[in-house]
C-alpha cells in the first residue's frame, strides 16, 4: 500500500502487458487518468478517482458515458489551454496532497510531449511532487544534490541493467560516482561539453551512489 504515492495514467502509447504487470503489484490510493489514459485504465480495469484533460483524444461523449457508469470526478479543459494535460494532472496530484507520483504513458509517443513531461518533472519537484516516469524499458526521475533517498542504487532494486545521468541544468557540479563501472570523482559536467559522459553506466557490485554539489540531473534506469 503506497499511501503518499498516486498514479497518473497519461495519454501516450502504453504497452498494455507492461502496464497490467506494473499496476498489479501496486496499490495506489489515488489514480488520475489523463485524456486517452482513460482508455488504458478501462482496459486494465482501473477505476480512476479523477479524469483530467480536454478529452480531444478519448472523446468527450465517451468520457461522460463512462463517468456516469463509474462515478469519478472530472476536470475538463478546452483544447486551447496553456498547460498540457499531464501538467494539469500534476496540479491535481498536488492539490490532493500527494508527494510522489508514478506516471505511465508519458513516453514513447510524441517527442514534444515526452520532453515537456521531463521539464514538467522539474516544476513538479519545485512544487513538492516527486515524479517517476515508467515505461516497459525505463524509469526516469530527477535528482538534486539533497536527494539522499534516491542517490543510492541497489543492483537488485534498479529497473534494469543501465543507469544514466543526463544534465537538465546547463552545468552539474562536483559529480562523484561511487560503485559504478565507470566512476567519477568531483567532476563538473556541462550540456555543451559532456552531453553523454554519464550515459549507460552499470553497477558491478551490490550498490552504487552518486553525489554532486549543484545542478539537476535526469536519471534513467533502463533495460534492453
Predicted segments, located by residue:
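N-terminal beta-strand-loop-alpha-helix module at the start
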Residues: 2-65
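Mobile, glycine- and charge-enriched loop segments
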Residues: 2-7, 30, 63-78, 205-224
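General beta-strand structural signal in soluble alpha/beta enzymes
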Residues: 9, 32-35, 53, 75-76, ...
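Short glycine/serine/threonine-rich phosphate/pyrophosphate-binding segments
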Residues: 16-18, 83-87, 110-115
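A glycine-rich helix N-cap at a beta->alpha junction
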Residues: 69-78, 128-132, 158-164, 172
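Short phosphate-binding loop-to-helix
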Residues: 73-96
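Anionic-ligand-binding alpha/beta catalytic cores of soluble enzymes and soluble regulatory domains
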Residues: 102-149
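Long, charged alpha-helical interface segments
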Residues: 138, 143-224
